[in-house]
Amino acid sequence: MPSSLGQPDGGGGGGGGGGGVGAAGEDPGPGPAPPPEGAQEAAPAPRPPPEPDDAAAALRLALDQLSALGLGGAGDTDEEGAAGDGAAAAGGADGGAAPEPVPPDGPEAGAPPTLAPAVAPGSLPLLDPNASPPPPPPPRPSPPDVFAGFAPHPAALGPPTLLADQMSVIGSRKKSVNMTECVPVPSSEHVAEIVGRQGCKIKALRAKTNTYIKTPVRGEEPVFIVTGRKEDVEMAKREILSAAEHFSIIRATRSKAGGLPGAAQGPPNLPGQTTIQVRVPYRVVGLVVGPKGATIKRIQQRTHTYIVTPGRDKEPVFAVTGMPENVDRAREEIEAHITLRTGAFTDAGPDSDFHANGTDVCLDLLGAAASLWAKTPNQGRRPPTATAGLRGDTALGAPSAPEAFYAGSRGGPSVPDPGPASPYSGSGNGGFAFGAEGPGAPVGTAAPDDCDFGFDFDFLALDLTVPAAATIWAPFERAAPLPAFSGCSTVNGAPGPPAAGARRSSGAGTPRHSPTLPEPGGLRLELPLSRRGAPDPVGALSWRPPQGPVSFPGGAAFSTATSLPSSPAAAACAPLDSGASENSRKPPSASSAPALARECVVCAEGEVMAALVPCGHNLFCMDCAVRICGKSEPECPACRTPATQAIHIFS
């Protein structure tokens, strides 16, 4: 083959170029003549244009950058196609014997091969539907994965089994939460018992079982609606049914016991028992019953009786059943409780169990004494037997056999005290008795006219069934009897017996209401104020002396104050007679007291409306009584007993 140096420079190149351009510009003929041999050899001689190499280099740089970012997969095909085109062009330019051109196909049959790189950079040949696609590039290794250090996306993982298990558990729980069950109970009373006060019980049950419990409305069927998980609903159902059954048992027990909420057993039906009725005012029925029946239960336990409380629409009468002495004791305790809480008895008539009197017995000194008052039994009811009359060995609040409280009262026989421990017996140390000369005076039957106080109702004797240490007279007890009162004075203006000598000889034995005060000397006493039934409206008067201790010449001191109760039923201590000794200090004015029934024995002008404490002499007007208590050494003009306070009597 001739070398390229022997070829003509201008003609061959120009002819080749012209032929190429002309072939590209003219329409192809039906049978184009093949180019001359010289033209085929001289065709690759000229340098290819630089545009395809520059475009391929720029494209290769861009594809390398995209490959570094992991996005060059789509550009591999273009890069390979461009590289192949460039290599083919370079081979055609360097080698003298170029590969045979592709058989002509279509209008580009006469196109020289040098124009192919310029026409098809990258994927441009694909835009021509008539052009044949380039051959597939050889496989290249994938670029390094720059995202290998990151965690895989959750979507790339398979379906998790743990999540499926959790969803199944949640689905089953949702099904159990929606469970609802109805729990019926027998009655609306059961509903109230299960719900509790202000819903406290049903709230606790909701919290305990972790359920929602809908309570039935008043007037609807007694059915609870429980919502929650299956096991929680079952637990709540068991609790509700158990509470309903428990309440049914309690109600059945109450119905067997007579329907009494305050009784644990039915009415006794033992031989020898009796039933009495104790009538009280309407306003004190709740006071006697007490909060939740506590007071009436305590009285039943102390007296061993069975007490039926009156209904709301019935008469205020308590039915007391038991042994005769226990029945009387229960009646006395009911009356004593009313007296302690209201400050006075309520008089409902001569035949009533409540009595009005003018006696102030310093109720707050007794504290929680079981009984304070005892009434002489009616003629139709036998008096209680004397078991331990006036003994001081019964503990406060402890159930015990009732004592005889009627010793020495009018119309009843005097009962001697068999107990040597009684501080108030006629033979014990420190004892005293009505109308007796000394501690060993005989005990006999009181005369019908003895101690006539002018009352239209039975005489009230003080119940002294409290321990000796708890009595109100404990500070005044001494080994030897002391003279206290002489003669029978008046109560509320009613005249008494004119002489005390007959009283001394009568020998009647009755316990005192007022203490025998010791002689002043070496003894310091502090007496609390007497009980007042209601707030004192006259307590702020200007003539009321201030409270304070008053000293006596012998060294004894007493607390002086005035106590003026405003209740009509509150009164002064009843004056009581005593068998004073012959040397008793009796003032001359005491003999004229019966003649001046309603006039003050001091000033003889004012009306008698005050009494002194503790002697209880109701002989003075209010001004004189206050003046007596305001002295440096206050003492009663009638008995020379130190006076601690003056009380106003509303008669």
UniProtKB/Swiss-Prot annotation:
GO terms for biological process: mRNA destabilization; mRNA localization resulting in post-transcriptional regulation of gene expression. This is RNA-binding protein MEX3D. Residues 1-159, 375-394, 401-443, 495-531 are annotated as: Disordered. GO terms for cellular component: nucleus; perinuclear region of cytoplasm. CDD domains: KH-I_MEX3_rpt1 (cd22423), KH-I_MEX3_rpt2 (cd22424), RING-HC_MEX3D (cd16723). Residues 55-69, 85-99, 434-443, 499-509, 519-531 have a biased composition (Low complexity). Ubiquitously expressed in all the cell lines and tissues tested. PROSITE patterns: KH_TYPE_1, ZF_RING_2. Residues 131-144 have a biased composition (Pro residues). The lineage of its organism: Eukaryota, Metazoa, Chordata, Craniata, Vertebrata. The modification Phosphothreonine is found at residue 510. It comes from the Eukaryota. Pfam families: KH_1 (PF00013), zf-C3HC4_3 (PF13920). Its main location: cytoplasm. The modification Phosphoserine is found at residue 514. A zinc finger (RING-type) spans 600-640. The keyword RNA-binding applies. It is found in: Cytoplasm; Nucleus. Residues 8-23 have a biased composition (Gly residues). InterPro entries: KH-I_MEX3_rpt1, KH-I_MEX3_rpt2, KH_dom, KH_dom_type_1, KH_dom_type_1_sf, MEX3, Znf_RING, Znf_RING/FYVE/PHD. RNA binding protein, may be involved in post-transcriptional regulatory mechanisms. Binds RNA through its KH domains. GO terms for molecular function: mRNA 3'-UTR AU-rich region binding; RNA binding; zinc ion binding. Phosphorylated.
